[in-house]
């Protein structure tokens, strides 16, 4: 059996779909469906069971084996709202929760794959998986960086796989429940359908209008990385998961406009509350990921957004 936490969320539900495509249905999905709209992400999935996160944690704490051999825990469950400033809530959901699962897995030699984030780098300009480059700009990034630091301390004595993935700007199907935290491609499409135009921020930090650059990665490529590590339980560590190629927000906007054959691009003032807390540039250093043996390719913004817009039109 495989356990996917956050399995009704964005990346987690895409992992479940990919496991189904492999013929796997022995999947326990763990999530918090307080936001009931997330059910849509797993309504078409084939799973063996569902557990609420709180019940799951109670059973983990009691040492429950869940009645079956656990092949791996793929931990995607977390609070991913970068504008959330309730530090106690964030540390409980992202740090303490992850530590509990990590030790459960280590004690039973169960592979543990988990979601970290490029938010650990914050305002830095070097995106290499080393502590000196970690400068989080918000408590979300800090919660992820702190758990990565914890993992580094236990890895030397771990007898089973522990692999963390620093996701960069992920976009694609099944993110509609994320609201303000959904990708820029998702929001631009909604703007275009509503107003016939799309809005980007004016320039900041020395970048021109819409020229801020991020490493945008299609969710299907993120899933491929997770499944590669699932297939290679001998590989542990913390890895960047991006394309290794930054592109501009203008690139995303033009890809959305192209998919809909028209529309206007406008620029709006940069929000005051984001100044000093905004990553104007990210680009994953993939040296460590490639060195681990992953040789998969990644879609460009143009390719990924086109695929995503087609999926949205069909669903």
Swiss-Prot record:
Pathway assigned in UniProt: Nucleotide-sugar biosynthesis; ADP-L-glycero-beta-D-manno-heptose biosynthesis; ADP-L-glycero-beta-D-manno-heptose from D-glycero-beta-D-manno-heptose 7-phosphate: step 4/4
GO molecular function, one term: NADP binding
Binding of substrate, residues: 169, 180, 187, 201-204, 214, 278
InterPro entries named among the record's database cross-references: Epimerase_deHydtase, Heptose_epim, NAD(P)-bd_dom_sf
Main enzyme class: isomerase
Keyword match tRNA processing: no
Entry EC no(s): 5.1.3.20
Cofactor: binding details: Binds 1 NADP(+) per subunit.
Domain of life: Bacteria
Transmembrane segments: none
Catalytic reactions on record: ADP-D-glycero-beta-D-manno-heptose = ADP-L-glycero-beta-D-manno-heptose
Function: Catalyzes the interconversion between ADP-D-glycero-beta-D-manno-heptose and ADP-L-glycero-beta-D-manno-heptose via an epimerization at carbon 6 of the heptose.
Subunit structure as annotated in this protein's UniProt entry: Homopentamer.
NCBIfam families registered for this protein in UniProt: heptose_epim, PRK11150.1
Similarity comment text for this entry: Belongs to the NAD(P)-dependent epimerase/dehydratase family. HldD subfamily.
Name used for this protein in its record: ADP-L-glycero-D-manno-heptose-6-epimerase
Protein species of origin: Syntrophotalea carbinolica (strain DSM 2380 / NBRC 103641 / GraBd1)
